[in-house]
């Protein structure tokens, strides 16, 4: 029975409303490992699946989860109820390329000046 309290049932809600899981994860599981699970279990029929952990953001209880933290760090009192499943929202962000990082056009062209007379 002690094992139940050391695990958390998590389902991952994708942007289209479909889910991955639920699946049990030990309290010591890092957020980075959760993201690896999302990548490995991403539905094959869905386009634009994530390729790396950096492309995946997990949100739980309104907080963006940090890769280095564990499931235990984000556990809520509600998750201790029998049969409780925690839903984490999955956001995919495409990696930013070097071309996108560079500002477009001449920086002087984007200035705005106001004068009151």
From Swiss-Prot:
Changing residue 114 to S: Loss of prenylation and membrane localization. It is found in: Cell membrane. It comes from the Eukaryota. The modification Cysteine methyl ester is found at residue 114. Heat stable and remains soluble at temperatures exceeding 90 degrees Celsius. PANTHER family: MEMBRANE-ANCHORED UBIQUITIN-FOLD PROTEIN 1, UBIQUITIN-LIKE PROTEIN 3 HCG-1 PROTEIN. This is Membrane-anchored ubiquitin-fold protein 1.
